[in-house]
């Protein structure tokens, strides 16, 4: 068995879910059950995390079996594994898939409330009026529980944007905090791929968190 490597926050959640499911039911969960429990868009997202866990040597995937997951080791949650910096993301893929992680910053996720799950580099001046500036690293808490008025990280196709969230019925408005920018309007009945990845919980600027 390969040596254990530190897990990302999301990978730890998947591992813990598998362990709990085995302890409570005597069998591992299916990809569909993992997706439903952790709020993934599809079982394919769960599969990507399972493959990452297998590469890190903490589970074994048995091919051709819906519950073909076997734990290879028990692990403790790391005290401070750092936060992944997310780069360009392809539509339909999990934002925390390994191929999207450009670097890892040794920042304690618990410095932010709620806890941060990843970092996203800010490009442009669309949010400058509330102090989110070009080049900042935005700390993001992964959640689908969004309220109007919150600063969110949204994905439209393969574009990731940081804006203030407002929803009216089936229409979402993503507002800039700069009068030079018009809001982005998303009709949920027409847009084939739109997803909220999380909420902003802090900013890192010049190695200082804010």
From Swiss-Prot:
The active site is at residues 126, 163. Residues 31-51 bind DNA. GO terms for molecular function: DNA binding; serine-type endopeptidase activity. Transmembrane segments: none annotated. It comes from the Bacteria. Keywords: Autocatalytic cleavage, DNA damage, DNA repair, DNA replication, DNA-binding, Hydrolase, Repressor, SOS response, Transcription, Transcription regulation. The record marks 91-92 as: Cleavage. It catalyses: Hydrolysis of Ala-|-Gly bond in repressor LexA. Homodimer. Belongs to the peptidase S24 family. This is LexA repressor. It comes from Histophilus somni (strain 2336). The lineage of its organism: Bacteria, Pseudomonadati, Pseudomonadota, Gammaproteobacteria, Pasteurellales.
């Amino acid at each position: 068995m390969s040596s254990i490597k530190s897990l990302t926050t999301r990978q730890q959640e998947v591992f813990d879910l598998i362990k709990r499911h085995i302890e409570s039911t005597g069998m591992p969960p299916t990809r569909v059950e993992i997706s439903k429990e952790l709020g993934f868009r599809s079982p394919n997202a769960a599969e990507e995390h399972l493959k990452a866990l297998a590469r890190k040597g903490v589970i074994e995937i048995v091919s051709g079996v819906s519950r073909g997951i076997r734990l290879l080791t028990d692990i403790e949650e790391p005290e401070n594994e750092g936060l992944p910096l997310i780069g360009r993301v392809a539509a339909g893929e999990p934002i925390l898939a390994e191929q999207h992680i450009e670097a890892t910053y040794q920042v304690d996720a618990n410095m932010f409330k709620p806890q941060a799950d990843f970092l996203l580099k800010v490009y442009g001046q669309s949010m400058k009026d509330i102090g989110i500036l070009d080049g900042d690293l935005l700390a993001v808490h992964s959640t689908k529980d969004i309220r109007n008025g919150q600063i969110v990280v949204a994905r439209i196709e393969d574009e990731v944007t940081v804006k203030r969230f407002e929803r009216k019925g089936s229409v979402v408005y993503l507002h800039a905090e700069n009068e030079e920018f018009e809001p982005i309007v998303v009709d949920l009945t027409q847009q084939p791929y739109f997803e909220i990845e999380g909420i902003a919980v802090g900013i890192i600027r010049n190695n200082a968190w804010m």
